[in-house]
Amino acid sequence: MLNWIRSGAPWIWLTGGAVSISLLSVLGLLLLIGWKGLTYFWPAPLYQWNVTSLTPVQGEVLHENTILIGQIYERSFVPRSYLPVDAVKKLDEDEDFATRLNIKIANRELYPADFISVLQMQLDEPTTPKEWAVIERSSGGYFFGKLVAFQDGDKLYQTDIQTVLNKKLDDAETLRHEIDSLVVDQLKDLGWKLEQLRLDKRKHELNNTVTDDFLAQNLQQKEQVEQELAKLDLQLDGLRLQLSGYALIVEDMTGSHVSIPLEDILDYWYPNQMSLPDKVMHWGKQVWKFLSEDPRESNSEGGVFPAIFGTVFLVLIMSIIVMPLGVVAAIYLHEYAKNNAFTRIIRIAVINLAGVPSIVYGVFGLGFFVYTIGASIDNVFYAERLPAPTFGTPGLLWSALTLAVFTLPVVIVTTEEGLTRIPSSVRHGSLALGATQFETLWRVVLPMATPAIITGLILAIARAAGEVAPLMLVGVVKLASSLPVDGQFPYVHLDRKFMHLGFHIYDVGFQTSNIEAARPLVYATSFLLVTVIVGLNLTAISIRNNLREKYRTLGQD
């Protein structure tokens, strides 16, 4: 036994077990958030229960001989000691737990909450009626009901409702796309022109160069733009009017008839009539909508495309900033600076910077970048916009710079380690052939150190992509009205605020009023953030591997 311990075999098993536990933990975490997130888009069946007794639910009472329609959201087990006396009497002697159902009943405008919690013993066996539909709305959440009629102005269709509704939904979708196109392509452009005219006038006033001819020309252009705006408003009002006048009449679980305007209906489906291929197609459609649409209902519904775009774009801008700074700093420290007390202090400071909490970088970015540099830029280049700030307020540029400072130590350390691994004989050979130190560095050393530089980029992306705390101070918002990139000059707007997947997770998980409904969305967004980070890292790793193979013959590896 002692010989076996002295051989080192136990430590091999110990390290192997630690690696296995780490891998299982990571895979288990990914499976958990992946399963809970991706099942959010699966069309869950609608159940119907008959209430068999007076059932208290969240301060209210479900009366006998009524039906309950909903989706089973969660099952939990309640110990016997936690149950009311009447519920304990219904338990068998050998039963120590009762099953509690968390049921989503939707229909938010009719009931005080989307969810109710009830003991399963107080309900009879559920059925899955095929006539009940799930209606997805632009506001108000989902609606569960039976289609009764479709109202087209004065006409009321009570037969072949689905055919009429499908046609009207297609027409409504076409009108929505046309309205969105006019708003994005023309309305925003006209608003931008009006703002530019106002700023141009303000700039001339500040420079004391206002003339009567300029004022007349400015007024004429303003009136022309306002006329175009008035025409566009009339066109938009006409399109919106075409959406009104239609309504779907639906019966809810109490037997009441509810009128839902067509303009509020996004989609509908019968989950209990779907086959497995239908459910798979519906799941894929919902996943695509999640990835490609904007959020709605205070981020608790809809898609996350602005957050995906903001996250990826922020990482790209951060990488563009941090890579030159980190590489140049590492080159100076390794190739040019003397090994004295000053450079040793710099290296110690760089290493210690990696341990500073991220929120401290956020405070630094807010105080230095936003309030100092940003305010100075506004005073010099955007005086006509004051007192409204342009760069003197949190935005994408300051967020990227803050994350660049946050990840700078990682890039410096990995790049310097890569430069250290290059054999000195390579440098001496280049210098012996007549190359200068800069030519040796540019044509020989840096290409061979590229894999290490890309490794620094990978670590920087992995560290920065999921950071939220500093971004809350320097640019991220709950909902951004515009993307940082659009068709208006200068096309890339680094002064704009943006959305981020990490902050979106925090906002949906802790800031929404309907936390039960938003919980699956938290898992889905978390899984998406992990996927985005892994995708960015795999891209950088593939580039590094290609470069490593390219310079392998030079003895780099």
Pin down the residues of each PLM region.
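Membrane-topology segments of multi-pass transport proteins
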Residues: 1-16, 20-28, 34-299, 555-557
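Membrane-interfacial helix termini and adjacent extracytoplasmic/periplasmic loops
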Residues: 283-302, 337, 361-405, 475-477, ...
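Interhelical loop and adjacent transmembrane-helix boundary motif
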Residues: 298, 475-527
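Transmembrane-helix boundary motif in ABC transporter permease subunits
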Residues: 318-350, 363, 540-549
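Membrane-embedded alpha-helices of multi-pass transport/permease systems
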Residues: 324-329, 360-363, 398, 405-426, ...
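Transmembrane alpha-helices
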Residues: 412-416, 423, 437-475
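C-terminal transmembrane helix and the adjacent membrane-cytosol boundary/short C-terminal tail
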Residues: 416-424, 458, 503-557
